[in-house]
Amino acid sequence: MSHARDDHQGASQGSQWLSQARTLVQEGTLFNFIRCLLLFQGDSGQKEMTPGKKIPIFVDGVVLNGPQTDVKAGEKFVEEACRLIMEEVVLKATDVNEKVCEWQPPEQLRQLLDLEMRDTGESQDKLLKLCQDVIHFSVKTNHPRFFNQLYAGLDYYSLAARIITEALNPSIYTYEVSPVFLLVEEAVLKKMIECVGWKEGDGIFNPGGSVSNMCAMNLARYRHCPDIKEKGLSGLPRLILFTSAECHYSMKKAASFLGIGTQNVYFVETDGRGKMIPEDLEKQIWQARQEGAVPFLVCATSGTTVLGAFDPLDEIAEVCERHGLWLHVDASWGGSALVSRKHRRLLHGIHRADSVAWNPHKMLMAGIQCSALLVKDKSDLLKKCYSAKATYLFQQDKFYDVSYDTGDKSIQCSRRPDAFKFWMTWKALGTSGLEERVNRAFALSRYLVDEIKKREGFKLLMEPEYTNVCFWYIPPSLREMEEGPEFWRKLSLVAPAIKEKMMKKGSLMLGYQPHRGKVNFFRQVVISPQVSREDMDFLLDEIDSLGRDM
């Protein structure tokens, strides 16, 4: 009986297969029909399927048997791509003989790169060539002479962590899908909170300091008027926030995005070093109240973008406490000084803040992006402000402690495990190693300042407080000229012209900007431990070489 049943089942399956095959031929899908034949692996006289083989299943003309991806080819491609990364990125990261960039204008770069997406895929050899081109024409931010931004250098431990997370492709909103990375984030946040000086607190990692600042602004507003979450802006009084005239531009963006309005961002005057003046802050708070507006937030800055200035947090906290205002500290750039016993004094009083933004991807080289928003509150204010209680993610009847499902503390759903990069570096170096990294950056900046003072044609903007060294290069043609309007007009042209030359040569990258009435000057920032005294000397020598004939 069993043999008869098997024969009947085989005949039925064969009949089903023939019916599907006829349909494919009638529809003209010859390719799928051939695949069907190959998968069936039988002949017209075969009554039973080959042991271990399954007849092909079709849905809408698509064969569903087996994986579509060529696994072996994929593994080979990843292996070759990783070899390319090691040879062209990692091994060359500290080689000063390599160019920082291979500058090409957009029109020419488009011609050099094959950017078009086609109907058919490219060969693996072509893809590897594209990878090589991408590396070749990209700016080498790992290079010891890349000084253009507030990030630089290569941290090998962070890089390894990034490779792991890219391969695992996790998203951290619930413990069930990302158990390790949620516990890692919890551990890192706890340690960062200790660095700030709080006994306890809360926090979340965000995609950059701008988002952390915006989330802090929204959190402060929610604390002030919690009904806004459900009722929106209607019926709210005119809300005012105060920040330094030297603040990061993300403050204006956040006010615009949140519906507060950029006109309701009051910019507090700064002193000659770029620090917020607490007396002007208090004056503006009273002025806002006289206008019938409602102050709710003060945003101080620890480490301004251009000058590297640190606002006087203790004095600002006194003002905030008198007026009942939330104090947020944007320490995206300067927060890393907290790990240095010698330099953490720059952030004295930060423990009095209600929230802090801190980017380990800057001086601590955790890799972009790695930004934490730290909050002193422990009443679940983050979750109350941002939760949407999506029932498909945050079920309350799970078999584990759902307090580990932290996704409702964030404005995001999918969220990268950015804390893991910083955790790996911290585990590798220890707090003392991070401290040494910060102290070395300060020492190299001090060396550069001393060299600038010694050299003819270089002029400091001011003595730096952090590792931002701002200076002018004055070419020989201007050195005997009186410092009047014409002198400053001509000097304003020098930094952009030298920047163009260094970019086209590929020798180094250095930022410049005008700032609050001062004409274009260079801003040199030391971050990477791969940077040496010789690189500081080269920086000044190269600027002099490129600008001497101007």
Curated annotation (Swiss-Prot):
Cofactor(s), names only, from the UniProt record: pyridoxal 5'-phosphate
BP term (GO), one: carboxylic acid metabolic process
Give a Pfam family name: Pyridoxal_deC
Q: For the modification N6-(pyridoxal phosphate)lysine, which residues carry it?
A: K362
According to the record, the signal peptide region is none
Assembly and oligomerization = Homodimer.
Highest taxon of the lineage: Eukaryota
Q: Which gene is the coding source of this polypeptide chain?
A: Gadl1
What does the similarity note say? Belongs to the group II decarboxylase family.
Keyword Lyase carried by entry: yes
Protein name per its UniProtKB record: Acidic amino acid decarboxylase GADL1
